[in-house]
Amino acid sequence: MRTLCIGDIHGNYKALVEVLERSKFDMKKDRLISLGDIYDGHSKGPECVDLLMKIKNFVWVLGNHDEYVRRWFTGDWKKFPDGEARWLRKGGSITRDAYHKNGKLNKKLVKKHAEFIKQAVLYFIDEKNRLYVHAGIDWKYAVDKQPSEKNYYTGRDTWRVDATKL
């Protein structure tokens, strides 16, 4: 099984399809790890998610834009007091509008995607002990003991690589 990573799709369905085609991605055999931000930016976020749902070995690492959409799906903005307004300013209005058809919210699609996004993880460690995360972590803490889950999708710490392990 090959493992391929993709990050920051931002609703660009055409680019997602092109990357999968050019890499000769096998939807049944290969693993795709999304490093987050499937949503916001382009208007085809729902189409991207529909395609990703067809991949047998798909890992969704949560990005900050995915977290915004997840909160929009649930209406839970407690941890983000200005979250919805901020999300709408940062590309969320495009995603929100993409879930509407003829001016009405497509509740069936929202429900389906809200269920699928529940599988998203804050980070992923594969069988070779490689860490996959959207943004970063605070290196003073263990990967699974971060002081805030926001570190995983908004952290800006510099990555460390141990070249002796490569």
Per-range role (PLM):
Residues R2, I6, G11-R86:
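Core catalytic region of metal-dependent phosphoesterases/phosphodiesterases
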Residues R86-L166:
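Acidic, His/Gly-enriched loop-helix segments that form or flank divalent-metal centers
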